[in-house]
Amino acid sequence: MCDMYSDFILGSSSKCRSQLLEVLGFFPKRSIGPEIDESPKKGELPLTYAKRMAYEKALKLKRVCHEENVITADTVASCGRRILPKACCDEDVRYCLEFLSGRRHRLYTSLCLVTKSGEVRQRTVMTVLKFKRLSNEEIEFYLATKEGIGKAGGYSIQGMAQGFVLFIRGSYFNVVGLPAYEVISLLRSVGVFQQSREALYSQGVKDAK
């Protein structure tokens, strides 16, 4: 009976996504970051790319977790038709911030759930943001924080970059990387329900350390 609270595998190595799930009351059996080729196809639109990444991650994870519900997420930053990189170095972060300075952009997070029986369920959320004009000093200071490394669009909304944002239209949690309403809806659709960490610990489902 207790398995209904943790009956899924999270296809992500992101500590932030794991923490957000726990805040929402979901505790995956395991978290595994599936490795796939994340190169955009020629002419691929940002929305299509986000959906494809989440789907391919879920399929790869399902191959090794055959009898489990698996859920994956992929966040993509874009400006117009341009897909911005997931920053892997300071130069990527600088490129993204210089490009986004004074501009409106979009963040897509696509969620993909593959059920135990192999059924695919997918939801995608879009949020629009606008950055203020950034000075060279602000960009250099942000580079020194290293917050943008590994982030779509080269920034983390939970850190110093929140001071760059003039407005957000849409889900804030989508910008963080895990839209809450859609996650809850998908997991509940396969019988995975929310529970507190304390209740899980008292039932012996999960180590509360």
Curated annotation (Swiss-Prot):
Catalytically driven reaction(s): a ribonucleoside 5'-triphosphate + H2O = a ribonucleoside 5'-phosphate + diphosphate + H(+); a 2'-deoxyribonucleoside 5'-triphosphate + H2O = a 2'-deoxyribonucleoside 5'-phosphate + diphosphate + H(+)
Active site: 74
EC number(s) recorded for this UniProt protein: 3.6.1.9
Main subcellular location of this protein, as a coarse class: cytoplasm
A GO MF term: nucleoside triphosphate diphosphatase activity
Record-level GO BP terms: nucleotide metabolic process
Superkingdom assignment: Bacteria
GO cellular component terms, A-Z: cytoplasm
Stored Pfam families: Maf
Key words of the record: Cytoplasm, Hydrolase, Nucleotide metabolism
Keyword Cell cycle attributed: no
The keyword Lyase appears for this protein: no
Cofactor(s) needed for function: a divalent metal cation
Intracellular or extracellular location(s): Cytoplasm
SUPFAM superfamilies, per the entry: ITPase-like
Family: Belongs to the Maf family.
HAMAP family listed in its UniProt record: Maf
Function: Nucleoside triphosphate pyrophosphatase. May have a dual role in cell division arrest and in preventing the incorporation of modified nucleotides into cellular nucleic acids.
Protein name: Nucleoside triphosphate pyrophosphatase
